[in-house]
């Protein structure tokens, strides 16, 4: 897949909205602003889609682990429903956009399983029932691992994010190899010029300017691994362990992708 290349910033510019970060969040933001006629600029310190986005297992789902019982306990039913609805709308928006591009978009069921903790699955299901989710409890799932059950979100999706970015980035106002070294209000200072903006959207993986929270002291490197197996079974869905140290599974074409082994 060939991702379009974009020039470096060369001199000062003015824009209504500055987006910092060229992963899927930043590029999608630029895409929507472009569609709506808003003057914008996106800057990326290296190449777009060269960080987290190009290494993801690329599941699009409103199911982010077993989070709904926690949100329900902390925020109540109304905000839990809002969170669910927002993510369902985002999924449908992806579906709408992907109709126009070849990016291997497929609707698939998503499962969060547990190897030993059935109680946490049942707790999550009770929360999902309270907020009227379409989730289902599954006693048995088709993965090469013994489980005690799974929470299923039907009709979620998977895709190829590199193919997706390659298509939606065409024609966007992007500057690559443009590193923001300092923010002065809403003005970004780079090695090749300043960007004067009315609004700034930070779409980087972590805070890049040390303002509040001293995040640079709290950050740590986390690594996980993925392998692609040939001649493996078709599991017809996307699966992830509720335990952070567990494994994820999904098919891509004739391959079976296995992820896991996360550690600091």
Describe every region a protein language model picked out.
Residues 35-55:
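Glycine-rich FAD pyrophosphate-binding loop
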Residues 66-72, 92-167:
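Flavin (FAD/FMN) cofactor-binding and adjacent substrate-gating region
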Residues 1-17, 35:
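Extreme N-terminal leader/targeting segments of oxidoreductases
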Residues 21-23, 45:
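Glycine-rich Rossmann-fold phosphate-binding loop(s) that bind the pyrophosphate
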Residues 26:
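N-terminal Rossmann-fold NAD(P) dinucleotide-binding loop
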Residues 125-128, 150-199, 203:
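Helical element adjacent to the flavin cofactor pocket in flavoenzyme catalytic cores
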